[in-house]
Amino acid sequence: MKNHIYIHIPFCESKCPYCAFGSFSDKFGLIARYFDALYKEINRANLGEISSVFIGGGTPSVVKADFYEPIFEILRPNLDKNAEITIEINPGTINKSKLEKYKEAGINRISIGLQSSKINLLKEIGRIHTYEDFEDTVKLAKEVGFTNINVDIMIGIPNQTIYDVEDTLDKILALDLTHISVYSLIYEDGTLMTKMIDDGNLDEVDEEIERYMYWYAKRRLEDNGFIHYEISNFAKPSYRCKHNLGCWSQKEYLGFGVAAASYIDNFRMKNTDSLEKYINNINNDKFYKNLTIEEKQTIDDQMKEFVILRLRMMEGFRASDFTAKFNKDVYKVFENQIGKLLEEDLIFAEEFGYLRLTKKGLDLANIVWGEFI
């Protein structure tokens, strides 16, 4: 069985006010110790054949590029010859030398966090870069030889207008990228931005306007040759993200690093959120103390998750795929839920057996998921 690997790099120059991921802007003194612990954790794992590697954060590009080569010395013997290897980078934390070292290590895909082309909106969400920094990063990446480049953009930012989204799309479409992710700003519990909303110091974008931004972005991207293959993701032909496809298809994945999650043999596990505990436990050969089993999925859990994750995909899923995996009829297992969603025009059934979200279902996806939780 082929595995997918996630590696978490938790360091950031500053914590964005909307970010709920495990990241630290005040612990740079622990970088070397963290990577030493990370090497040990990866080295003791049963890696199997690796289909994809995703290095996320945090801001992986904020640390020296030399820290990554030892990781790939460990992974390289297990990498599939067509493995997709992604690293997230942020403009303002990257230079040509880092990109060259990434390429030499074997990284073949980069994901750049732009979010918006408008400086006022970047400041609103705590980003430390400008659009010009992003454009320079893309140019450098192409000079070094990267051909698989994703950019993340965000909609629903406070004070954002449809004209801001138009400007962002105009600019990034001119750069000939291969993958674009369009995310709605989500106000996660415990973040500074959520507190500002709760305290009345910040206004959310009207939901109807945010949805208009989404459909505008979808149309523009599809008109420019991008395939809309998942709710938030658009790719040029042959450039769909293998790592994410694996996760959405319930493939197993191994997570390394602080706060990293794993999915193995129907168990969902997660490493400690404490950077110091993570390092100390590994240095004391107490790897098990870092790991918490969050869920042992039953067959019912697996079937529900199958439907939720597959409906995230624009192609949906065939009833026969469900039967092949679980030896059950999805229409019988979820008779009430599917009947209700069909009646409410949130999903539709195609003549070839596919179940998919409707346009209305795309806008109300959380209601669809709620039927299976």
Model-inferred region functions:
Residues 1-9:
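Immediate flanking context of iron-sulfur cluster ligation sites
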Residues 2, 20, 24-44, 49-328:
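C-terminal scaffold of the Radical SAM
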Residues 10-21:
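Local cysteine-cluster metal-coordination motifs and their immediate loop/turn environment
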Residues 234, 351-355:
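Short, Lys/Arg-rich nucleic-acid/phosphate-binding segment
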Residues 328-342:
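Short amphipathic alpha-helical interaction segments
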Residues 342-352:
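A short, conserved structural fragment
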Residues 360-373:
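Short, amphipathic alpha-helical interaction segments positioned at domain boundaries
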